[in-house]
């Protein structure tokens, strides 16, 4: 045996473990598994993510599956911004309302195939006004401005359109759109509480709606999303591309397991969950009010999607999405954790 052939064999033996490890990685994502970039927004509707972050549940579930997960957290405002971040590759998992999920599912149908990963729970969204003259949708005038996270595409915007369509017919679904204005929840809540700006109403989410009702004596509820949707429904969901799910199976599974663990923790320990929220969000709300919000019997902490199809049918009916979903399963990934959804 020549020295050259001997060296070649030694080199092959030395490289064999490296080549084997590389062959086991998903194609095109040698560095992807174990990295997770999550975009959330504002409010208690993201509590499960706050608990998962505070308790390091994603990292814990990753270790149980043999992968060290590095989690990056980003906070954005509005479903449109979240969707742009997802499609640009800036994030791996998006957190937003059901309406932005349906928008991006429709937009990527047959391409990136974005679908829902899990729900973050069912919460009532309240349309709150500080204008004593506004008690119903019919009472809004051109002097009123309704703040919401994103005009047209946010879940609040779509629920408002659905409520308008129920009152005046589908052809009039955008009747109040001219009164809406995009504003992050914290800023909108501050405006409604102060009562000194053009923002007289806010289609909010907890805890901001609770703060408004508690801190401005003129603030009152004009509309409850549960009434519009026919019962409790998932307020906020998480979604990702088909590619990310396929190329990062252990990271994805760990993430879903961490969410389920966070939901169980929150149901069993609402006050500890409130403390986690306060730590992650650096305060910003009275603890007693926050605990009251978390314990609200209308609130359900679960990763299982609930009553999302009503909005999906409406968006197809008015032409907001081009692809008609036959059931909620069309726009959610098929996972055991969410199998009993709707």
Model-derived segments and their meaning:
Residues 28-32:
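Sec/Tat signal peptide C-region and signal peptidase I cleavage site
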Residues 59-68, 226-230, 296-305:
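Short, solvent-exposed loop/beta-turn-alpha elements that line the ligand-binding surface or hinge
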């Amino acid at each position: 045996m020549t020295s050259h052939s001997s060296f070649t064999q030694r080199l092959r033996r030395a490289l064999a473990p490296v080549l084997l490890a590389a062959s086991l990685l998903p194609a095109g994502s040698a560095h992807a598994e174990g990295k997770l970039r999550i975009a959330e927004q504002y409010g208690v509707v993201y509590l499960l993510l706050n608990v998962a972050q505070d308790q390091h549940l994603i990292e814990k579930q990753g270790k149980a599956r043999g992968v060290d997960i590095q989690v990056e957290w980003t906070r954005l405002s509005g479903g449109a911004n979240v969707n742009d971040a997802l499609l640009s590759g800036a994030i791996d998992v998006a957190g937003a309302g059901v309406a932005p999920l349906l928008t991006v599912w429709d937009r990527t149908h047959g391409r990136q195939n974005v679908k829902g990963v899990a729900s973050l729970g069912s919460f009532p969204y309240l349309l709150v006004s500080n204008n004593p003259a506004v008690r119903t949708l019919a009472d809004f005038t051109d002097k009123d401005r309704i703040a919401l996270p994103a005009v047209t595409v946010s879940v609040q915007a779509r629920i408002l359109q659905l409520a308008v369509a129920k009152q005046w017919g589908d052809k009039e679904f955008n009747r109040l759109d001219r009164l809406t204005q995009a504003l992050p929840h914290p800023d909108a809540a501050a405006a409604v509480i102060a009562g000194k700006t053009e923002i007289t109403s806010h289609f909010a989410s907890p805890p901001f709606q609770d703060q408004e009702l508690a801190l401005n004596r003129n603030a009152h509820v004009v509309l409850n999303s549960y009434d519009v949707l026919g019962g409790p429904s998932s307020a906020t969901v998480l979604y990702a591309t088909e590619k990310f799910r396929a190329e990062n199976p252990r990271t994805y599974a760990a993430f879903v397991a961490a969410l389920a663990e966070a939901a169980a923790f929150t149901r069993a320990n609402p006050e500890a969950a409130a403390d986690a929220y306060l730590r992650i969000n650096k305060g910003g709300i009275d603890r007693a009010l926050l605990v009251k919000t978390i314990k609200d019997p209308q609130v359900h902490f679960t990763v299982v999607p609930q009553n999302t199809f009503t909005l999906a049918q409406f968006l197809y009916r008015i032409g907001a999405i081009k692809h008609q979903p036959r059931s909620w399963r069309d726009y959610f990934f098929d996972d055991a954790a969410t199998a009993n959804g709707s």
